[in-house]
Amino acid sequence: MASVVEALIPGGKANPGPPLGPALGPLGVNIKDVIEKINEKTKDYNGMQVPVKVIVNDDKSVEIEVGTPPTSALILKELNIEKGSGESGTVVVGNLEIAQVAKIARMKKDDILSYSLKAAIKEVMGTCVPMGVTIENLDPRECQKAVDEGKFDESLTAEAW
């Protein structure tokens, strides 16, 4: 039966220390090779925490599955800031354009439950609320209503889902 190790690691910077090394050591795989493969697969997410699943089969072969970073991490990267607001609702730390929100929604396409770009955009907007991030200089909840009303339809027609 295969063993599975799941961890949240910095993109492109996995190392043999915790959390991966101690979990992989008892499984008898070459930790150095596994770390190199993980770093190769996660290099595009440099500076972000990335969920990684390492599946070690009985014959010691290894499969690596890389998820996408949390939506909040993608929002922070898009805004080039370190962290969200500690006082959401009163302190605004950044503003996203609707095209940036659509870009994040497309990046999360495989991980979210939405069937349409509009629904995915509304999910991303929902993550912006507690982070203190506005969209088109509006509260994200107002933007969600605007998406429902079709106010961004022209902007989103060029966006592929």
Curated annotation (Swiss-Prot):
It comes from Methanococcoides burtonii (strain DSM 6242 / NBRC 107633 / OCM 468 / ACE-M). The gene is rpl11. Part of the ribosomal stalk of the 50S ribosomal subunit. Interacts with L10 and the large rRNA to form the base of the stalk. L10 forms an elongated spine to which L12 dimers bind in a sequential fashion forming a multimeric L10(L12)X complex. GO terms for biological process: translation. CDD domains: Ribosomal_L11. GO terms for molecular function: large ribosomal subunit rRNA binding; structural constituent of ribosome. This is Large ribosomal subunit protein uL11. Pfam families: Ribosomal_L11, Ribosomal_L11_N. It comes from the Archaea. InterPro entries: Ribosomal_uL11, Ribosomal_uL11_C, Ribosomal_uL11_C_sf, Ribosomal_uL11_N, Ribosomal_uL11_N_sf. One of its GO terms (cellular component) is large ribosomal subunit. Forms part of the ribosomal stalk which helps the ribosome interact with GTP-bound translation factors. The keyword Ribosomal protein applies. The lineage of its organism: Archaea, Methanobacteriati, Methanobacteriota, Stenosarchaea group, Methanomicrobia. Keywords: Ribonucleoprotein, Ribosomal protein, RNA-binding, rRNA-binding. Belongs to the universal ribosomal protein uL11 family.
